């Protein structure tokens, strides 16, 4: 997608740490964290895509139970949701919700940002399957995307809520390395920008 910068630093293959090391580091960090929000953030653009992700998810959930950390895990689940991704979300349902991101429901906006959402029927089926397994879900929508209007964004929120989904809304950010950060992209879509303070 034009707003995303995952992998832009190297454009190369990702190397995995050994599974045993990952699990031990999760156990170590969760047993010692002083993070008052008890939030764990996974920096994986497609969590649930690999078979080993089930073991990682199980370790995170077990640590949440044993160490009371994490209470919440922020996860970017694999975009092409399949049975494994649902199993991973089910393993972690005590410490996370499954994001079923849309960004927008407007077809021309999706084209502008080079994104294709899963078909509506597949989205509905996925939502029902998650509900059946006790997995809470939410959808993410981004306001300010190229071609999005106030009316089309509100329409997207209403449509998403009617699908019985919680909605998380974010502003479009320009991230260095993403296509929408380029001067050409800003000029093509007449993007006006402002700076904002990011609390740390």
Question: What are the residue ranges of the model-derived segments?
Answer:
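Conserved catalytic-core segments centered on acid/base and nucleophilic motifs
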Residues: 137, 142-145, 157-161, 167
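Flexible glycine/acidic-rich beta-alpha junction loops that bind and position SAM and/or redox cofactors
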Residues: 51, 108-114, 146-151, 163-200
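Short acidic (Asp/Glu) and glycine-rich catalytic loops that position anionic groups and cofactors
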Residues: 3-6, 36-40, 106-107, 135-136, ...
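Catalytic cores of alpha/beta
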Residues: 85-89, 146-162
């Amino acid at each position: 997608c034009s707003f995303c910068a995952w992998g832009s630093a190297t454009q190369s293959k990702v190397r995995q740490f050994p599974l045993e090391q990952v699990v031990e580091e999760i156990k170590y960090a969760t047993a010692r964290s002083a993070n008052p929000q008890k939030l764990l953030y996974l920096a994986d653009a497609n969590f649930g895509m690999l078979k080993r992700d089930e073991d990682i998810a199980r370790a995170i959930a077990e640590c949440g139970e044993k160490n009371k950390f994490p209470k919440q895990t922020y996860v970017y689940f694999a975009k092409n949701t399949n049975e494994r991704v649902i199993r991973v979300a089910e393993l972690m349902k005590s410490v996370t919700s499954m994001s079923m991101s849309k960004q927008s429901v407007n077809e021309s906006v999706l084209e502008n940002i080079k994104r294709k959402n899963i078909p509506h029927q597949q989205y509905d089926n996925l939502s029902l399957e998650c509900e059946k397994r006790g997995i809470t879900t939410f959808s993410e929508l981004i306001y300010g995307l190229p071609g999005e209007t106030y009316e089309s964004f509100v329409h997207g929120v209403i449509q998403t809520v009617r699908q019985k989904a919680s909605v998380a809304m974010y502003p479009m950010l320009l991230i260095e390395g993403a296509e929408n950060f380029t001067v050409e992209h800003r000029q093509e879509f007449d993007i006006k920008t402002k700076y904002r303070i990011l609390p740390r």
